[in-house]
């Protein structure tokens, strides 16, 4: 279920403050954040965010196509190593 339109998109206050501060100072350094739940807004276009995936920070450069998505969608938390049997089937053939 999506968020109500009357509530508007969610973004953590501290992340918005960091974004506006970087925009005013024209700072190009990546913005470090743990806020995977924040929605990407048009004000964030052109910035790089280091999004934490639980282990390391993944750099995410925001473009127009990212608007409306969550920051966490671009920093995967799980690594898929493949199914156990599929490797042995390839070797056997």
From Swiss-Prot:
S-S bridge residues: none
GO MF annotation terms: rRNA binding; structural constituent of ribosome
Superkingdom: Bacteria
GO cellular component terms attached to this protein's record: cytoplasm; small ribosomal subunit
GO terms for biological process, alphabetical: ribosomal small subunit assembly; translation
A Pfam family the protein falls into: Ribosomal_S19
Alphabetic keyword roster: Ribonucleoprotein, Ribosomal protein, RNA-binding, rRNA-binding
Task of the protein: Protein S19 forms a complex with S13 that binds strongly to the 16S ribosomal RNA.
Family affiliation: Belongs to the universal ribosomal protein uS19 family.
Protein name: Small ribosomal subunit protein uS19
Species annotation: Helicobacter acinonychis (strain Sheeba)
């Amino acid at each position: 279920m999506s968020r109500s339109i009357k509530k508007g998109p969610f973004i953590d206050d501290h992340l918005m403050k960091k974004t506006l501060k970087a925009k005013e100072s024209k700072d190009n350094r990546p913005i470090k954040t743990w806020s995977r739940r924040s929605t990407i807004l048009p004000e964030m276009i052109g910035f790089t965010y280091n999004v934490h995936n639980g282990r390391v920070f993944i750099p995410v450069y925001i473009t127009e196509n990212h608007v409306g998505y969550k920051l966490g969608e671009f920093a995967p938390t799980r690594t898929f190593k493949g199914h156990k049997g599929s490797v042995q089937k390839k070797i056997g053939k």
